[in-house]
Regions:
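A generic structural motif
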Residues: 15-17
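A short, compositionally biased
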Residues: 7-13
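Short amphipathic beta-strand and strand-loop transition segments with alternating hydrophobic
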Residues: 3-6, 71
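Short, surface-exposed loop motifs enriched in S/T, G, D/E and P with embedded aromatic residues
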Residues: 2, 25
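ATP-dependent carboxylate-amine ligase
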Residues: 10, 20, 26-33, 39-226
Length: 226
């Protein structure tokens, strides 16, 4: 079981117990949920009789894939390569638990001040509808406004009719744009983002938030770095 998790800027370190002994491991991406999933990997390793030390080493090099929490540094100016923003591409799916975990990661991120025209870095979220939640879908979207860590996010942009429930529930200071579809939101990103920002993009796959991710990548000069 996982007993302690420390989320750092570029990694997550966890302590727990497995096979009746203490275990210490890390994953090369921030996120409490990644550490919990990693303990499951170690349990499978043990069940299959594989090398635990080798598994721990591999976890220390593991990074999230595209659409599932991949972090990229987008260089915004080829003349001044220090002008960057950080992108968290989590656009493949969304439900209340996974979105809450992603918001926790964003809330703990460190924007960079003094880089762009806004002068201070911001935590910005682009959130699309969470699908297939049944009768409580509107209430579950509204409830995101009071999730732990939400108060640390500077601007929340919302996509889709269900996320409009969240948009209406947010304080005025956090309320960004609301758009019916991802294409409309993607057309705005170049005007809304600046150097120093940390940006999360997340929504159910059918909402097409990958368009927003692509629009952010197109702001870059040269290949993005992970």
């Amino acid at each position: 079981r996982v007993e302690e998790v420390t989320v750092c800027d570029a990694a997550t370190v966890a302590r727990g117990r497995a096979w009746r002994t203490p275990v210490l491991y890390k994953v090369a991406v921030p996120g409490r949920h990644f550490a919990i999933n990693a303990m499951g990997v170690l349990a499978v390793t043990h069940a299959l009789g594989l090398d635990r030390a080798l598994a721990v080493t591999a976890l220390g090099q593991w990074q999230a894939g595209a659409g599932r929490g991949l972090r990229e540094v987008i260089v915004l100016d080829k003349v001044e390569p220090h002008l960057t923003l950080d992108l968290i591409d989590d656009a493949y799916n969304a439900n209340p638990a996974s979105l809450g975990a992603a918001l926790e990661v964003l809330a703990g991120a460190r924007p960079k001040d003094g880089l762009g025209r806004v002068s201070h870095g911001r935590r910005i979220a682009y959130l699309g509808d969470m699908k297939e939640l049944g009768r409580e879908e509107q209430a579950l979207h509204r409830a995101l406004a009071t999730r732990p860590g939400m108060e640390r996010i500077d601007i929340v942009h919302c996509v889709g009719p269900l996320m409009r429930e969240l948009w209406r529930s947010l304080p005025e200071r956090q309320r960004g744009h609301w758009c019916e579809d991802s294409a409309s939101m993607a057309a705005r990103v170049a005007h809304d983002l600046d150097a120093g920002d940390v940006v999360l993009v997340k929504g159910s796959l059918s909402m097409g938030l990958g368009r927003v991710v692509d629009a952010i990548r197109k702001m870059g000069h040269g290949p993005a770095t992970v």
